[in-house]
């Protein structure tokens, strides 16, 4: 009794759907591999699950090259059946360069993880010692850079301190010169203020005495007896007898 025909529709049961996907996917990948080997065909298979997971198979060494060939066949000029030697050489060189870059990238990724302390299990003793030396060298360089940076900051602060001290010194000198300048322009200013009243009083007295001093006259203008003149001179000038020497002598009054 033969199998009945299976109706093609979406399987509603989630578990059955996943089991069916795994079986059909493995069978499809196996058929693609058999087709490429038996018929010497270039086969490329790309499968995405409902969760977005990728499954692929390519009979050639590069899936990208197969996709580029597919794109050229559909959207570009027809590719010649037999490629030239130059094209094969360029393609081989590009592929080798890609493999070298990929290997270098993987090595750098491993080194970075090892420096972060990850994936250290597969490393041998020598590799661990080399990693330790690299870390020590990196720490020394970092400490040297930090020390140099701190020294540079210290030198800058010291330079600023010297500049501020010089500025402060200059301002102090200017302030001291500002206080001394009025004294240099009038050093006896206090004496003038102190003796101002006394000087005015003395000047008034001198002018008063000068007003009542006797006038010096020629001998021919003097009149009266000599004795009376001498008596008036000995008595000294005053407000009452200042003009006695000038008055005419009256003999009748004696």
UniProtKB/Swiss-Prot annotation:
Domain MADS-box: from-to ranges:
3-57
Domain K-box as annotated: residue spans: 91-181
MF terms from GO for this chain are: DNA-binding transcription factor activity; protein dimerization activity; RNA polymerase II transcription regulatory region sequence-specific DNA binding
Supply the CDD domains for this chain: MADS_MEF2_like
Give the main localization category.
nucleus
Query: What highest taxon heads this organism's lineage?
Result: Eukaryota
One Pfam family linked to the record: K-box
Instruction: Say if the entry is tagged with keyword Transmembrane.
Output: no
Q: Where is this protein localized, as stated in its record?
A: Nucleus
For this record, an example GO cellular component is: nucleus
What are the protein's UniProt keywords?
DNA-binding, Nucleus, Transcription, Transcription regulation
* One GO BP: positive regulation of transcription by RNA polymerase II
Function description: Probable transcription factor active in inflorescence development and floral organogenesis.
- Its protein name is Agamous-like MADS-box protein AGL9 homolog
> Whose protein is this, by species?
Sinapis alba (White mustard)
Gene that this polypeptide is encoded by: AGL9
């Amino acid at each position: 009794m033969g199998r009945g025909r299976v109706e093609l529709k979406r399987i509603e049961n989630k578990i059955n759907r996943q089991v069916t996907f795994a079986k059909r996917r493995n069978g499809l990948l196996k058929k693609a591999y058999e087709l490429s080997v038996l018929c010497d065909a270039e086969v490329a298979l790309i499968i995405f699950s409902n969760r977005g997971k990728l499954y692929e198979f390519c009979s050639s060494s590069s899936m990208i090259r197969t996709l580029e060939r597919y794109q050229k066949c559909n959207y570009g000029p027809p590719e010649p059946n037999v490629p030239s030697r130059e094209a094969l050489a360029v393609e081989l060189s590009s592929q080798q360069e890609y493999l070298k870059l990929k290997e270098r990238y993987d090595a750098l990724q491993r080194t970075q993880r090892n420096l972060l302390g990850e994936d250290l299990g597969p490393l041998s003793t020598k590799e661990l010692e080399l990693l330790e030396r690299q870390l020590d060298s990196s720490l020394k360089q970092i400490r040297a850079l930090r020390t140099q940076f701190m020294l540079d900051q210290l030198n800058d602060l010291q330079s600023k301190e010297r500049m501020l001290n010089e500025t402060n010194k200059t301002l102090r000198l200017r302030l001291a010169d500002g206080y001394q300048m009025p004294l240099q322009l009038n050093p006896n200013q206090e004496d003038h203020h102190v003796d101002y009243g006394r000087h005015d009083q003395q000047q008034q007295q001198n002018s008063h005495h000068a007003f009542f001093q006797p006038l010096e006259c020629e001998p021919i203008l003097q009149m009266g007896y000599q004795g009376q003149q001498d008596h008036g001179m000995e008595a000294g000038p005053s407000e009452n007898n200042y003009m006695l020497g000038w008055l005419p002598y009256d003999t009748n009054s004696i």
